[in-house]
């Protein structure tokens, strides 16, 4: 079964983008390549349980087992050594990516208090969009009683778009609630 958002992309978004930017070839049309969700767990250096609960939260949210990220080098100010576990991340592609994006845009973000839309300034110049989330409770799968600590995460949308404008239009047509 094709995810709802992928169907919308194929039937509505591609024609809309071709009309707006005048692509000659269907392969030129930008598409979502992957979504990376990263959770930095600074407390993991003292308490291994924190990392385990972050990993379980992230696997529930993403529907896929995350990998534990380790420190690349030692930093005395942060009291971390090389190869110390300091967070976890998960990379979603294809079906899971579309399902997660659909859930994020239509269920999770509208549940945030005082939500007025996401910033349209968080593009990196190469057509990728980053979004910071303050708490994992906005996802319906996370049970409020089982949460030991409110954790934020970074969500990065990697697209094949060449420019920020193309990527913004792609995400807007897919249903990303931009503020302006």
From Swiss-Prot:
One of its GO terms (molecular function) is tRNA binding. GO terms for cellular component: ribonucleoprotein complex; ribosome. One of its GO terms (biological process) is translation. Part of the 50S ribosomal subunit; part of the 5S rRNA/L5/L18/L25 subcomplex. Contacts the 5S rRNA and the P site tRNA. Forms a bridge to the 30S subunit in the 70S ribosome. This is one of the proteins that bind and probably mediate the attachment of the 5S RNA into the large ribosomal subunit, where it forms part of the central protuberance. In the 70S ribosome it contacts protein S13 of the 30S subunit (bridge B1b), connecting the 2 subunits; this bridge is implicated in subunit movement. Contacts the P site tRNA; the 5S rRNA and some of its associated proteins might help stabilize positioning of ribosome-bound tRNAs. Keywords: Ribonucleoprotein, Ribosomal protein, RNA-binding, rRNA-binding, tRNA-binding. Belongs to the universal ribosomal protein uL5 family. It holds the Pfam family Ribosomal_L5_C. This is Large ribosomal subunit protein uL5. Disulfide bonds: none annotated.
């Amino acid at each position: 079964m094709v995810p709802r958002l992928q169907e919308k992309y194929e039937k509505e978004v591609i024609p809309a983008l071709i009309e707006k930017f005048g692509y000659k070839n269907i392969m030129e049309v930008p598409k979502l390549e992957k979504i990376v969700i990263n959770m930095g767990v600074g407390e993991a250096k003292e308490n291994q349980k924190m990392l385990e609960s972050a990993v379980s939260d992230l696997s529930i949210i993403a529907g896929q087992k995350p990998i534990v990220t380790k420190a690349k080098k030692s930093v005395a100010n942060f009291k971390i050594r090389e190869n110390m576990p300091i967070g976890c991340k998960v990379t979603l592609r294809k079906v899971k990516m579309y399902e997660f994006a659909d859930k994020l845009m239509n269920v999770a973000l509208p549940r945030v208090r005082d939500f007025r839309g996401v910033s349209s300034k968080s593009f990196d110049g190469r057509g990728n969009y980053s979004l910071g989330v303050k708490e994992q409770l906005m996802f319906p799968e996370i049970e409020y009683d089982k949460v030991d600590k409110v954790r934020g995460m970074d969500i990065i949308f990697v697209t094949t778009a060449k420019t920020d404008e193309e990527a913004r239009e792609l995400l807007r047509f897919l249903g990303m609630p931009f503020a302006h």
